[in-house]
Amino acid sequence: KEARPDALILSGDLTLDGEKVNHQEFAGRLRELEAAGVPVLVIPGNHDINNHNASAYFGDERTYVESVSPEEFKEIYGEFGYAEAASQAPDSLSYLYILNDTTWVMMLDTCIYNPENLVYGVIPEGTLVWMEQCLQSAYSQGITVIPVGHHNLQELSRVYVEECVIENHREAIKIFERYLTPVFLSGHLHVQRIMKHISEPGEDSDVYGIWEIVSNSLIIPPCQYGILNLHKDG
């Protein structure tokens, strides 16, 4: 609250295993931030929707509890990005948020939860088309777009090498770089990482490539977060 950022961006995994009661309680905490003047933007992570592992724990006893559907997720977190969205994708929980006159935030839902919850992620075809339309519009107006997804755009971990990178990441990178997108924010790994996309080995470090910044899940100890400051070159 004291830092007063332009927005708090949460790239998914808002709960342990998609428990409805946890979503509801977490949304209550986020309302405190919005009441203090900090806009909050959320998208789901692979833990958050249609999760059959949703559980309550009483001592050593585990009881399965209700998770949430995509529609319920959007209803619970409606005031944290969705209600203020300038545009929404036709086939996912992705949306575009206008941060200010020069910056848009594109919240991309990369999760697979229909008909069941899966760990890996993909950007649906309709969302890819919508994504490029938004980027094209922003580019023509000189506006910077910061895309955010739960799953990763690149292979950033030698430990977690499966089900982390967006299935159609190559296509997504081509679209992002077509419009000189500066950075992609992601989660999923629950660590802090940063990497620049290189088109081919040995490429000069001065050649443009989209950067990716991975941030930890805010709800999981040690509850790490990152601060992104945007400055115009020159």
Regions found by a protein language model. Give the residues of each.
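N-terminal active-site segment of His-dependent metallophosphoesterases
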Residues: 1-20
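Active-site metal-binding loops of divalent metal-dependent hydrolases
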Residues: 12-14, 46-48, 110-111, 150-152, ...
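Binuclear metal-dependent phosphoesterase catalytic core
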Residues: 99, 204-234
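His/acidic metal-ligating clusters that form di-metal
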Residues: 4, 39, 98, 104-107, ...
